[in-house]
């Protein structure tokens, strides 16, 4: 028989084993939680309902200084005075001059002092809906965690340039705010979709048709604590969020947040600077348009020599004078000498297991632009230009027919799944691969870092 000492020893070992097992479960759950997306609601700074159409604007990086100057006109409430403040200086003033950043901060203060921008009195999530050509995409406006970006849970698919990062970092620092949101995608989620649709059936806070793009923009405020809890919990189940558009803004916002963490001796992790503003859309709702190429010459080849060279890697079909649009992945449209051609990549020219090599932007860059036309660097070669967004194939035809360009190449749009696959693999998309539309309007909401 076992002695009392033996029994006590067994009981003690069992207790130790049980406690160890429980601690392992707790630690595992904490690790899983830390490896999921973290978001929070925030007190948005927004224009009053009656002023939103005066304040709102296109994002800073889709127009130049003179276009911003023209669009702002005599409207002193235009957000361009904050995001393109060089328009308040004589023509030719560099947008990177120190006085321009200082003007942005002065104008931001002026907007708040004048009541053109007002901070909400409590934390909210928000819903931002955009309707283009009858299709609506619904985004959740959230505070995204800086650490998620720094540790790779917010995934990117483009390279960023340090000079552009520093420009946006200066803008964030001087305003102590994320003036413009970044554009995220997340895997489809039925619970979040149901919640969003419930709000979408109610009257929005904002509802307007934007000038120039002509798209409808609507905005709702989520005040219910239970709904906000659901949103936070559903995002906490997602291992990753994906930057769709705004890689430089994302990097700048996260890097400034990380700076503030480092420089604050009393940092707790609860400060507002630990988060930056993002609008998160379900991946399946997003629209990616084709991003096409026009080239100045055929690298010394005649038209027939160029076509013959293409036939080594593509099935080439003459489509005549009517505009031809690519019909599927790996099908391209060529415009040359007033005629359209269908180019279909032969199956041995790409590897379906390679997330980069299977992309049409990579296939066309390797087999046409590089191998035949000698264009090695899409970012720096002056012989090539890019036509994206809503301009359509008519713009390709116009630029070739005008004599400005020799040929045009149209691509089938990249899919959101391809982008997520590349981001998940830790790789980078080739340059000039994605064009999201519609763009986020700026000025609907701002996130303070205080």
Predicted segments with their positions:
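Surface-exposed, charge/polar-rich loops and edge strands
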Residues: 35-450
